[in-house]
Design a protein with these regions (language model features):
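Fold-independent oxyanion-binding glycine-rich loops
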Residues: 43-45, 75-77, 90, 133-134, ...
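Acidic/His- and Gly-rich active-site-bordering loop/insert found
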Residues: 2-102, 123
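Acidic/histidine-rich catalytic neighborhood of metal-dependent amide-processing enzymes
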Residues: 107-179
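Short glycine/serine- and small hydrophobic-enriched flexible loop segments
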Residues: 12, 116-122, 205-212
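Midchain, well-structured core segments that form catalytic/ion-binding scaffolds
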Residues: 149-236
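A short glycine/serine-rich beta->alpha loop
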Residues: 96-105, 188-193
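Secretory-pathway/membrane protein signature
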Residues: 1-2, 77, 124, 174-177, ...
Length: 238
């Protein structure tokens, strides 16, 4: 089919139900139909409930083998549940200069904008689309792209523009978190013999290392940013 304009594409995507607990294949197929001239990689999987899902990676620009770099646009196909709607959540109508429907802001409108922007770039400019699903729940689509996408690795974009509507204004970063579980293994023995190996002693060294990192993040200005709270480390329990 011929490419659709931004508003038309956003409305078409809104009209397809892709709440996180249902399949997004119809949305993925509709998006792929808009990507003529792009190399498209499909990454299919079953979610934890056995529902068929698909993430997409698309790339265009440069010559084969020399098309790395450039910009990647990223967005997700799934939406939150339709709780609280008093009108048809998948109507996709335009009223009062606004697109109405579930996911019109988060994030089928922005996703449509990514697609239209990528298509508008000169064919010689490398551009990649990273289109995920299950963003509202398990992040499984993004995890799959990171772990298995051959095309994303080959494209090696220099920067990523994520179209998530954070406070409805461009931001240059997003705070995240990481959790680590450290395990030390000892050798069991009676505490009076000294013949065992007490794993707690090894963990004390780990805790000291974590304290040093905590102090560095708290005190070293190189890790601080006026737009964010300072990065923070917590040792929860031993």
């Amino acid at each position: 089919m011929p490419p659709v304009d931004l508003v038309g594409l956003a409305a078409a995507l809104v009209r397809l139900d892709s709440r996180s607990f249902v399949s997004n294949l119809a949305v993925a197929e509709r998006i792929e139909a808009e990507l003529g001239g792009f190399e498209v990689e499909r990454l299919d999987y079953l979610d934890g409930a056995g529902v068929a899902k698909r993430a997409l990676v698309a790339h265009r620009g440069g010559t084969h083998g020399a098309a790395t770099g450039g910009l990647a646009f990223s967005g997700h196909m799934d939406t939150v549940p339709d709780t609280g709607w008093t009108t048809d959540p998948w109507d996709g109508r335009i009223a009062g200069g606004r697109l109405h429907g579930l996911g019109s802001t988060d994030m089928k409108g922005p996703l449509a904008a990514c697609i239209v922007a990528a298509r508008a770039l000169p064919a010689s400019v490398p551009v990649t689309l990273l289109i995920t699903t299950d963003e509202e729940t398990t992040k499984a689509g993004a995890r799959l792209i990171a772990a298995r996408s051959v095309l994303a690795r080959r494209a090696a974009p220099a920067a990523i523009l994520v179209a998530e509507p954070t406070v409805m204004t461009p931001v240059r970063g997003h705070r995240s978190s990481i959790a680590i579980t450290a395990v030390a293994t000892g050798v069991q023995a009676h505490s009076s013999t000294g013949k065992g190996r007490n794993a707690n002693w090894d963990l004390l060294g780990f805790a000291a290392d974590m304290k040093a990192i905590f102090e560095m993040l708290r005190d070293d200005a190189a890790w601080h940013d006026i737009d964010y709270d300072p990065p923070f480390l917590s040792l929860i329990h031993i």
